[in-house]
């Protein structure tokens, strides 16, 4: 099996220290390719995107004129449904009559990483977790770094508007981000106003999670991802059970052990379950997850571009709005919502649908690099002389707009970006194509009416 090596920077690598043997210093080794966080499907801690070497600094000769953030919540515990599956497996381990041998020998003195069931679906914090990847702490750091870079846009003694879905963990992330951004000036209702937007279908298009209102998307399902060969799971089950006769471990259980590895890292900083699999098995499982997400939340689903048009159109309108006194737009939602937005935007869209009969190398759609825990999309509006430009930073890496990257810092002129958006979603009618109830709001307005309308949906898990 792969021994997950820990480096000084707490990187978790699917390789041994031999990767350094033929180079003079560790700095010469390309170890990022082995980082286990690449292979855990976005369930594990945040990981920066592998970019193109383009500096994320504001380009010389330009000023930042507006910044938009669309962020996923931070690292969390497994959901209640995930937790139920993991507990069922743990019950099998606890009820096993015998001493565990082989790769599972650690189970002889192992304790389940979720000590309190009320933590399911919650964001990890220093209070409820033991590791270094607390979601609240990472959100705090993110907010502070964001202020350091874009603080010139923030008007002192003003009220910072923040837009968050009414998921408890999403709201929690937004709060800690705001604390990091505002520091000692943080005061709810005075220096920051949280606009809590319902995730329910009845808010229609006036939502950070418009997928809820798209009834036709709920009717749509793709069986494409199910064609992927998962016989490797049988081999894992056989390998683990062989020295432990009588243990009933199904392929579904094995698949869930990959998630166990990821979520335990969120809570404890590491997991012995990560050592159960080979390098190839991590890659195979990761691609299976990429397929599932691509054909449900990505461009493989014909409705995602339609749903994503709601946020993308609003983003474009904000970029064009020069009269608004606020130029710092902070929005928080879920991985599904960010992935759907990406489907509309198209920067990370593969040239062809993902194949199910083989793993393409390089893989053009790695879910963990698109929406890891704490994922973030920055939309920068740059003012360079008399011209305005748009640039995207996705998970801390500049991702140029296809065929529109000749501006400073590989940005795209705002007028050209508007044409790009029209080409992507100009033919979309969210209300009609999604079958949205005619009594629901037909457009997103909260970015413009939040000062006069109260958005305070009750928090839910």
Curated annotation (Swiss-Prot):
Keyword Phosphoprotein attributed: no
State the EC number(s). Answer: 3.1.3.-, 3.1.3.8
Known InterPro entries for this protein? Acid_Pase_AS, His_Pase_clade-2, His_PPase_superfam, Histidine_acid_Pase_euk
Residues glycosylated per entry = 97, 157, 229, 248, 302, 313, 437, 452
What induces or represses this gene? Answer: Expression is regulated by the HAP43 transcription factor.
Record's subcellular location? Secreted
- Which keywords appear in this protein's UniProt record, sorted alphabetically? Disulfide bond, Glycoprotein, Hydrolase, Secreted, Virulence
Disulfide bond entries = 62-384, 261-274, 404-412
Single GO term (MF): acid phosphatase activity
List positions binding 1D-myo-inositol hexakisphosphate. 72-73, 76, 79, 169, 293, 334-335
Cellular component (GO) terms are: cell surface; cell wall-bounded periplasmic space; extracellular region; fungal-type cell wall
TM ranges? none
Reactions mediated catalytically: 1D-myo-inositol hexakisphosphate + H2O = 1D-myo-inositol 1,2,4,5,6-pentakisphosphate + phosphate; 1D-myo-inositol 1,2,4,5,6-pentakisphosphate + H2O = 1D-myo-inositol 1,2,5,6-tetrakisphosphate + phosphate; 1D-myo-inositol 1,2,5,6-tetrakisphosphate + H2O = 1D-myo-inositol 1,2,6-trisphosphate + phosphate; 1D-myo-inositol 1,2,6-trisphosphate + H2O = 1D-myo-inositol 1,2-bisphosphate + phosphate
Tell me, what's a Pfam family for it? Answer: His_Phos_2
EC supergroup of this enzyme:
hydrolase
Q: Which family does it belong to?
A: Belongs to the histidine acid phosphatase family.
Tell me, in a sentence or two, what this protein's role is.
Answer: Catalyzes the phosphate monoester hydrolysis of phytic acid (myo-inositol hexakisphosphate), which results in the stepwise formation of myo-inositol pentakis-, tetrakis-, tris-, bis-, and monophosphates, as well as the liberation of inorganic phosphate. Myo-inositol 2-monophosphate is the end product. Responsible of about 25% of the phytase activity. The residual phytase activity might be contributed by other cytosolic or cellular enzymes such as acid phosphatase that also degraded the substrate phytate. Is essential for human tissue damage during infection.
- This protein is called what? Phytase PHO112
Q: Which gene encodes it?
A: PHO112
